[in-house]
């Protein structure tokens, strides 16, 4: 039996990555920084294949009860769910740390793919 988990992104999380890249590359006009930021986020997300519960749970409901974890990466926070039975990690959303997350769409439906 392997100790690793499959790590996947929700459709919303993939959209978040595209928006992060677009903002940094097109609004701030630093495409190299945008690429580097996405690389750092993806690297940290890939590391969730081992001991994904090592990061803190969020402290608000209903997500705390659903065991939503938060992984800080630079100025961004990756929100993800762990299914120990299926040995999967689903990245639900990726937000800028200073963003008002109370008013964000937290649909955690379909998983697009695994890394």
Task: Identify the residue ranges that each predicted region occupies.
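Basic, Lys/Arg-enriched alpha-helical interface segments
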Residues: 1-66, 109-115
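A beta-hairpin/wing motif
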Residues: 69-70
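Enriched for short, Lys/Arg-rich terminal
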Residues: 73-77, 81-115
């Amino acid at each position: 039996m392997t100790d690793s988990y499959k790590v996947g992104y929700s459709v919303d999380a993939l959209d978040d990555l595209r928006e992060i890249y677009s903002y940094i590359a097109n609004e701030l006009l630093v495409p190299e920084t945008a690429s580097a930021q996405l690389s750092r986020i993806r690297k940290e997300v890939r590391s969730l294949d081992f001991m994904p519960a090592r990061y803190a749970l969020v402290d608000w409901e209903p997500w705390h009860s659903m065991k939503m974890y938060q992984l800080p990466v630079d100025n961004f926070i990756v929100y993800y769910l762990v299914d120990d039975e299926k040995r999967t990690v689903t990245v639900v959303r990726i937000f800028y740390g200073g963003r008002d997350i109370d008013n964000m769409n937290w649909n955690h439906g379909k998983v697009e793919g695994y890394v």
